């Protein structure tokens, strides 16, 4: 499992539906020290909004990926390094496990498979928009999370396992359980990373932390603190 994400400590997720902090630019965003930018969101996303962010970020030397929330908002652009497509392993609705993906292939025909990978989401915050939209069963123990991670890696060959707590800082025991269950896949974590300390704490368990709302709420300096936190955790041998 040798995708570029195996080398990432930090991913910055840009929501096309949310503005940057006043006075900040996408050049500033690309200078935060993050390893890659992922463009995506759950609500009110359109192709036009996606394209605007792709165009703005593509001017800078930064790995750039789209995370499409549904097939209708996929942007076909050579400026993108690729597509990271969520599949929600604990979704109650089959549409978010494979149905949306089937529709994408049916509508658009052969995809750019060389640039397309999936993220095996395990959604654990019941109050998050993604949990509501996908009807995720978020009532999972640490053992459940470890089992989902194992199934995603071993049975389905997923290269990225993504523990999603969007909107709140997650249970480190559950993230640690997922990490212990994996042997090759890269473990992403997203949710509630608000500064150096939280990035360091979760960096002790996850291979890669994903920061999103912080960019839009507090700005690029706050994001840079999270970059430092996770990189220090990994340098200190926490993972």
From Swiss-Prot:
Main location group: cytoplasm
CDD domains: PcrB_like (cd02812)
GO biological process terms on file: glycerophospholipid biosynthetic process
Binding of Mg(2+), residues: 15, 42
Known pathway: Membrane lipid metabolism; glycerophospholipid metabolism
GO cellular component, one term: cytoplasm
E.C. number: 2.5.1.41
Pfam families per record: PcrB
Key words, A-Z: Cytoplasm, Lipid biosynthesis, Lipid metabolism, Magnesium, Metal-binding, Phospholipid biosynthesis, Phospholipid metabolism, Transferase
GO MF assignments: magnesium ion binding; phosphoglycerol geranylgeranyltransferase activity
Reactions accelerated catalytically: sn-glycerol 1-phosphate + (2E,6E,10E)-geranylgeranyl diphosphate = sn-3-O-(geranylgeranyl)glycerol 1-phosphate + diphosphate
Keyword Metal-binding recorded: yes
Enzyme class, first EC level, given as a word: transferase
Family: Belongs to the GGGP/HepGP synthase family. Group I subfamily.
Physiological role: Prenyltransferase that catalyzes the transfer of the geranylgeranyl moiety of geranylgeranyl diphosphate (GGPP) to the C3 hydroxyl of sn-glycerol-1-phosphate (G1P). This reaction is the first ether-bond-formation step in the biosynthesis of archaeal membrane lipids.
Name the record gives this protein: Geranylgeranylglyceryl phosphate synthase
Annotated source species: Haloquadratum walsbyi (strain DSM 16790 / HBSQ001)
